[in-house]
Amino acid sequence: IRGAFPSVVLVGMGVLLVARIGWLSDDSLITLRTALNMSHGWGPGFNVSEAVQGYTHPLWFLAWLGVGWISGQWIASVILMSLVATAAALTLVLLLPCERRIRFALLMLLALSNSFVEYSTSGLENPLSHAVVGSLMVLLVRQREVIERSFHGLAVGVVLSLVLLTRFDLVLLVAPLFIFWFIRASRSVRIAAVLGVLPLLASWFYWSLVTYDSLLPNTFYAKRNVNLSFMELFDQGFFYLRTSLAYDRAGGLLLLVGVVLTLAFMKPLAVASSLGIVLYLTYVASNGGDFMVGRFLSVPVYLSALSIAVSLEGWSLEPLVQSFRQNRMNSLLVRRFIGPPLLLVLSAILISSATAFSRQQSERFNWERPASRGIADERPMYVQRGSGFMRYFSEISVAVKSTYDPRTEDSSIVEISRRANGWPTRKDSEIQRPLTVRTTCGLLGGKSIISG
């Protein structure tokens, strides 16, 4: 118990840090509206009686649908899911077989990573992505202990299917890891893995095809249906990644160290992880990136932290520490002349821009300026509009209530919660199509919840 106490404290502090700057993005409310319509009898689409898969994260959608329907608290449920998934992701880092001080250092760097911390909430699938990717890595790392057990193969297959159902493009991130494991596994374990993957994926694809007449989300086809050349898309996507790294120096450091250690130690799982990260980021760039700075960097940054732990397995800081303790001159040089300046420079690099530890959480740049090329610093912008978790916590007695008043235009997280909790149920005698249709451009999710 005594040995686990520091780990529990660190994970708890990490969750509190994430909750402190937690927020709800407008895109997540598109998923929420679909879940509300489906749970209240209006059909499995964003618009009433129109079956279109407007969300990109089936497993996150199903989890939100289930927890929200059972609890009746739709915003509280996504806050809870995000924080639980974040706690799981941080705990999984501590389960990897490397020295404890290294694991603690990785948690600190993740806490300084803007992309990881900011998108551990947002209402999007990122926290679940962290948790399922981390679960897969832990299972693969421990393959040497149970590689001949069919149950282990079944577990790997099930977790892989959860990764894919969380977001289908994550297949590029984890495919090298799975292929490496699959080649080394015995025949019985391979069969078990396939049996673990197929049922969940087949069930979802069947339901999606019957319900939406499509295997993939509508957003996949929307992103590909643009009148732009590959080089134009890649240029914008590369700019997106560069901008995201500029505002997430800790994340960039994790990615860089992950690559360096992979090349230095050449551990197979670390090599597979780095290859997956390269494939995934190349795919993000080829699609033109995104408008939310850092969103598609959080999972690669987290996987890179896991890769570092794998690379440093069996490597200990203790001999280095002991040698410095025994040599007084080296110890004096490090403590007085090398350590403090190095720590100061590293801190200046990491904390020169706003992080989760900063009190100031205003927008780091204006998305409307031409130099931003449409990329926005989403979290501070929505917090200023009242979509931060702290606003919800401070008015929780009001937020848990139910209301349905289409006259109000308040789109804060508190009003979104009240409106979602009071979502009307369609009766059999009611018509399926609305009497009025509203069109809007921008902030579609929030406006759709407020308008009902």
PLM region spans:
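Membrane-proximal envelope and lipid/glycan-remodeling enzymes
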Residues: 1-452
